[in-house]
Amino acid sequence: DRAAPKLARFEEGLRASADARGHQFTNTLLGHSYGSTTSGKSVPMMAAGTIDNFVMFGSPGSGVRNIDAYGLPEGHVYESSTPYGDAVQGLGPDASYGTNPRKLEGITHLSGDTTGSANYTVATGALSFDNHMSYFDEGTRTSQDFANIIAGGKQTTDEEWEALQTAQGKITELDRNPWMKRYMEPNEAETPPPTTPDSMPGDPLARHS
């Protein structure tokens, strides 16, 4: 709570400094883990127009009870939650941490896909924290979403993400059509027996001897 007013003044200073120099920029505040709760509490303290977007990820709580408290336009408050291995997400009680961002009405939900992280692990326990630090890792869809928003854009669509993965060689035609592997990489056990004169391909009456 003590840090929230300081963060609000800092963000206001960034905006005031830019305005004084005639510099226009998209100011996106990103808050991770407990820092997202502090950020969430600071946004209502800021002067209107200080920030353009607010993104929470791996957040235990939004810092507010209602999205209107942020004073940001509709569609400019986001949350990202990896579905596995982040026990911090939504951990805090609403009374002190604010509403779980995933349940905050009116929020824009970003992809929580962190599987591209080199450190990604498949969570084996309900309280696993293994992927809590993976959101900003290179190669994740979460980091791509953040980059888009920071640049003044929107979250990555499924089509855009697939195209990007394809361009980087991470998605191939085999990934889209796994059944093709059967024909391109035949298993010896599945190799059909040699044809005989009375069992030629295409003969509906063919029988293997």
Regions found by a protein language model. Give the residues of each.
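Lipolytic serine-hydrolase domain surface
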Residues: 1-25, 45-209
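Gly/Ala-rich beta-loop-alpha elbow adjacent to hydrolase catalytic centers
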Residues: 30-39
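Short, hydrophobic alpha-helix immediately C-terminal to the catalytic nucleophile
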Residues: 40-44
